[in-house]
Amino acid sequence: MEISEARLTHLKELEAESIHIIREVAAEFDNPVMLYSIGKDSSVMLRLALKAFYPGTPPFPLMHVDTTWKFREMIAFRDRMARESGMELIVHINQEGVEQGIGPFTHGSKVHTDVMKTQSLKQAMDQHRFDAAFGGARRDEEKSRAKERVYSFRDRHHRWDPKGQRPELWQLYNGRVHKGESMRIFPLSNWTELDVWQYIYLEDIPIVPLYYAAERPVVDRDGTLIMVDDERMPLEEGEQPRYEKVRFRTLGCYPLTGAIRSEADTLPEIIQEMLLTRTSERQGRVIDHDSAGSMEEKKRQGYF
């Protein structure tokens, strides 16, 4: 697959901007952390962090907020990448949620996401006293993220106020925070899904195999193809998993992440397929459809 000179220049500019942001945060904040959700954006962000401090190791740890419902392949990939990067990996699980038996099937996506993701992240930020957290969100993903700054200020309760954002002129970022306050930092803000995939291709960045099309056991739930990843998934009466060739455009908790039928099992094929699609990559994320303005409300409460 050939990528034009103009696209290469564009990707190099994005790379330089992201590395600049990562270095700024490392220099400006006392205790930053990189949130590692194991998806393609996290993989790109990790590569940029490794480049930013090469030949040394990035001066901050990786942290994964584990809901206990991630795909098994994601967890295996997470542990492998942590070993290869040489970075410390913090895995945080909301034990209160586990003790209460919170899960996507028993309590629904809204409660599960709030307890096992949002509250869990806030616990981890407080426990480790992080004052900045890198995230892999991009502005092209979803409308609430489109209006979020690169440096996203969070108050003492980790809440985001979209009307109280700080100006960011000429790549100058205001990172001043008081004790207990923090910043969410998004180095990939100006990247698109196409940029991410082309960068993965050019840099030969490892990604979770779930992004590639393969025969997988799925059930159709209200038009969403859900992969049966383990024995915890309750099947409805008469429901039988069937093997179909599918892949995932986005990754999360397996009961809340829809697959797409696809034949794309190589990076060039994924990029070609992406160029022809007219739907958002987050179309398959059940949590984004809980209610109108669902993502913005989650972010106001402390979500990624």
From Swiss-Prot:
Heterodimer composed of CysD, the smaller subunit, and CysN. It catalyses: sulfate + ATP + H(+) = adenosine 5'-phosphosulfate + diphosphate. GO terms for molecular function: ATP binding; sulfate adenylyltransferase (ATP) activity. InterPro entries: PAPS_reduct_dom (IPR002500), Rossmann-like_a/b/a_fold (IPR014729), SO4_adenylTrfase_ssu (IPR011784), Sulfate_adenylyltrnsfr_sub2 (IPR050128). Signal peptide: none annotated. It comes from the Bacteria. GO terms for biological process: hydrogen sulfide biosynthetic process; sulfate assimilation. It is an enzyme of class 2 (transferase). This is Sulfate adenylyltransferase subunit 2. Pathway: Sulfur metabolism; hydrogen sulfide biosynthesis; sulfite from sulfate: step 1/3. Keywords: ATP-binding, Nucleotide-binding, Nucleotidyltransferase, Transferase. With CysN forms the ATP sulfurylase (ATPS) that catalyzes the adenylation of sulfate producing adenosine 5'-phosphosulfate (APS) and diphosphate, the first enzymatic step in sulfur assimilation pathway. APS synthesis involves the formation of a high-energy phosphoric-sulfuric acid anhydride bond driven by GTP hydrolysis by CysN coupled to ATP hydrolysis by CysD. Gene3D superfamilies: HUPs (3.40.50.620). The lineage of its organism: Bacteria, Pseudomonadati, Pseudomonadota, Gammaproteobacteria, Chromatiales. Belongs to the PAPS reductase family. CysD subfamily. PANTHER family: SULFATE ADENYLYLTRANSFERASE SUBUNIT 2. Its EC number is 2.7.7.4.
